[in-house]
Design a protein with these regions (language model features):
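Tandem repeat scaffolds
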Residues: 5-6, 11-157
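N-terminal hydrophobic targeting signals that begin at the initiator methionine
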Residues: 1-2
């Protein structure tokens, strides 16, 4: 009996499981794609074109958006905690009510970005970007209850 149980257990453990594998959308053109409300934890969007895509209300913790084109992309109400946004292009992107805590945004381009209610806690941003964001920063993140201005440390620049 032990042998049968052990054999079944070994077979189950060696079967591939999509729930354990992160989704890889790297180097794809996903213009206008609708991922709204999706669980995309750990997904890879490396160098992916997500222009006009809907990623609102998504769980994107630990995802990679390195070099992604996020022009006019809706990321509102999403969890982008610990996300890699290095070298990404955010132009007209909606980050309202988004949690970006502990994310990486080195060499990220930000233009005309909506940030009302966004949480930037522990996100290293160049001072010129912080100054630009502080001009329009307002709101409180509904998930972390932190004020956007406080997370950008607007009072200290």
């Amino acid at each position: 009996m032990r042998f049968i149980i052990l054999t079944v257990l070994m077979i189950v453990l060696t079967l591939p499981s999509s729930s354990f594998a992160a989704l890889d959308y790297g180097k794809q053109s996903l213009i206008g794609a609708d991922f709204s409300g999706s669980d995309l934890k750990g997904a890879t969007f490396y160098l992916t074109d997500l222009q006009d895509a809907n990623l609102s209300d998504c769980e994107l913790q630990n995802a990679t958006l390195y070099g992604a084109k996020l022009k006019d992309t809706n990321l509102s109400n999403s969890n982008l905690r610990e996300v890699t946004l290095d070298s990404a292009i955010l132009d007209g992107t909606d980050l309202s009510n988004t949690n970006l805590e502990d994310s990486f945004a080195y060499s990220t381009q930000f233009e005309n970005v909506k940030i009302q209610g966004a949480d930037f806690t522990n996100v290293f941003l160049p001072k010129d970007i912080v100054r630009k964001f502080c001009e329009s920063a307002s709101g409180t993140n509904p998930f972390t209850n932190r004020d956007t201005r406080d997370t950008l440390e607007c009072d200290y620049i």
